[in-house]
Amino acid sequence: MNPLVYFRIFNNEDCPCGSGKKFKECCKGKTDQEPVQSKKPPEVQIMEQMRKSMVKCCMHPDQSNCNGKIKNAHALQNNKIISLLAGTERHVYTMDKKRQPLIIPIEGEEPEVMVEFSRVSANDATTETCFCDRHDNIAFAVIEKGAPDFDVNSEPMKFVYAYKAFIFEYYKQEVSHKIFQQCFKKRPPVFQLPQMVGLYRVSQLRLKEFKPVKRHFDSEIMAGTYNGIETCVITIPERINFANYTFIAPDYDLNGKG
């Protein structure tokens, strides 16, 4: 297939604005709603919109039993990993999505967008508004405050660590996709540029890959089981002052199979 087809919106596909209508019946041919053309690249506009519009919701599958406010849930455990990094001053350095991204001009190429690091309170590090108070306490209790250190033989621990890394990344992808839809609705001509359609295709693909994984996690959580997760533990023989979490789809598995 010609790869160029991924960089255009087709008449009969669902409109990227999220209306549910076909593109030709919705945003095709619409003009830009913004009165003044922004000098910022569209991808920077999306990042800025994300900083302002993080959705508050609970990602736990047991929606009927949500209780309490949507809280700033930590992707990395505040009372374990973050506390070790924060020390007595209770601060860490992290990529700051609340700050204005830097736009680095590169001669003859697209500008590079960079997110700066900032010193932030441990209470604010790696937080997202993606769990209600009840489910934040229940879903991650096995690895949170008062729980023993990580046990390589504990299936519940391995499952919950995998789930936590996944669900926070899934939440961010969903929010990013919704914000793209909002931006497309306001500025169809700008967000039909090839580089923006490319970002949209990547977002579509990620959600397509993520959704069956979420369905698996949801079904296991509701059943109270921990199946379907294979964990590879790599032990570093000394402590390092760095921590991260992510969910990715590698090109090859641990045995080199594609």
PLM region spans:
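Extracellular cysteine-rich, disulfide-stabilized repeat modules
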Residues: 13-16
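A structural signal for the main folded, soluble domain(s) of proteins
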Residues: 29, 33-39, 71-72, 143-145, ...
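Pre-Walker A adenine-sensing motif
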Residues: 2-4
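An N-terminal structural lobe/cap that precedes and organizes the functional/catalytic core
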Residues: 6-11, 28-136, 141
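Extracellular repeat turn/loop positions enriched in glycine and acidic/polar residues, especially those
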Residues: 18-20
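C-terminal, charged low-complexity interaction regions
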Residues: 194-258
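Long, hydrophobic, well-ordered secondary-structure blocks that form the structural core
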Residues: 140-209
